[in-house]
Amino acid sequence: MDIEAYFERIGYKNSRNKLDLETLTDILEHQIRAVPFENLNMHCGEAMELGLETIFDHIVRRNRGGWCLQVNQLLYWALTTIGFQTTMLGGYVYIPAANKYSTGMIHLLLQVTIDGRNYIADAGFGSSSQMWQPLELISGKDQPQMPSIFRLTEQKGIWYLDQIRREQYIPNTEFLNSDLLPKTTHQKVYSFTLEPRKIEDFESMNTYLQTSPTSAFTTTSFCSLQTPEGVHCLVGFTLTYRIFNYKDNTDLIEFKTLIEEEVEEVLKNIFKISLGRKLVPKPGNGSFTI
């Protein structure tokens, strides 16, 4: 695996000699704007694999994306390769419909230590809950970013990530009650501990997420990609573009329902990916929000 090929894939041409917050932020921002958060393989009859060599080939050489266990593992490899002190952590995603965090450790995130300070770096949550910059690991501090205000809170060794969103404006009134829209401005995202993890700790969950009928990932095909102004999302046949802080502290969200013949073109032109096999889009049951 070639680190220069990774940097070319994400379009990163800046310095990688300084192991500082600016470099970490720059690499994270480049990856989330180049590598989609997506699970389309499993809706093309293919597996979402965890092997680093396979992930490198899939994302870097074949120009695809992946979910957190893939894109954050790739980010972990890149950061450690150039010398950042990086640790894998395991997260539990908040499920609004159940009003609780997942019982299984279904999310991979990273802790990066720079000059004695700890930061959370996560390139694998997607949609409008995706952080654009690393979050300093400080409890109770509001950390404003373009997507929203993020806040980390620690209670008895467990850390919680929340976000405070802006109001939303949806010009197409047909979608005002869409299940894809977050229902509140204050949203819980996930919880985690600082216990170091290895990728092997996620293997059984990686299988469960793409095979269990109770997994939201088996009923929902999704693809999201950050832009300098917002985020594109494709869930089933529904394409959205959210422009952050369009005006008056409000996000603008544009909706479009695609026909089957448009999906491949949208994936190529907006998300910059091409699939090797036919995609069967699935709309899900409201568990994925944009």
Curated annotation (Swiss-Prot):
CoA binds at residues 103-104, 208, 214, 287. Substrate binds at residues 106-107. It is an enzyme of class 2 (transferase). InterPro entries: Arylamine_N-AcTrfase, Arylamine_NAT_domain_sf, Papain-like_cys_pep_sf. It catalyses: an arylamine + acetyl-CoA = an N-acetylarylamine + CoA; an N-hydroxyarylamine + acetyl-CoA = an N-acetoxyarylamine + CoA. Its EC number is 2.3.1.5, 2.3.1.118. Gene3D superfamilies: 3.30.2140.20. Keywords: Acyltransferase, Cytoplasm, Transferase. Its main location: cytoplasm. One of its GO terms (cellular component) is cytoplasm. The active site is at residues 68, 107, 122. It comes from the Eukaryota. Catalyzes the N- or O-acetylation of various arylamine and heterocyclic amine substrates, and participates in the detoxification of a plethora of hydrazine and arylamine drugs. This is Arylamine N-acetyltransferase 2. It comes from Macaca mulatta. The gene is NAT2.
